[in-house]
Amino acid sequence: MKICKGLAITLFAVWCGTGTISAAEGPGAQGKDPVYPIAQGAVQAEIGSAAPLFVLDGVVGQEFKKISLSDYRGRWVVLFFYPGDFTFVCPTEITGFNAALDEFGKASADVLAVSADSKFSHLAWLKSDALGKIGYPLLSDFTKQTARAYGVLDENTGTPRRGLFLIDPAGVIQYLVVHGDKVGRSVEETLRVLVALQTEELCPLNWKPGASTIRPKK
């Protein structure tokens, strides 16, 4: 009986999402930065391009909050999409990135996680004790516009693929990777690439923080 009740609560949480705001908003509204609107069906995300801006409903701790990508301008952002709450591989990624928050902080980077689940589903998941305390926002792309803009929406299932983007302080995508649903991503590799990008130098195969970079002779 308890299992059925818990399942009913979970299904209700997923179903009753009110949707999310997925639109360009931020400093551009004050004329300081350009605004990159998310158009239906548009795929704008590629290395060297401006990261599509968004404002999404999210859960921070156990409170609802609207999160705007533009609020993170001036810092690196680790933005990763995942297929869904209450799954199997996804919680290992959510908790894995959370365990490395201090390391990302040392690299002046903030972490944001996005799925197409409702904010109510996120809250129910966080309250289920399956994740423990998570120190970064879980965002709800209920309309799927953000996942579509970043080119990671599986149109057949309506869920995001495991896409990860490193966005620099100027709001430009510097790295992206997309995994199949069955394979989780590597926190260690994400940190390695992040630090490598921050050197702004040539980093050879398997380069690790503290190792020598390549400096062509003039």
Give the ranges of each region predicted by the language model.
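Chalcogenol-based redox active-site neighborhoods
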Residues: 23-218
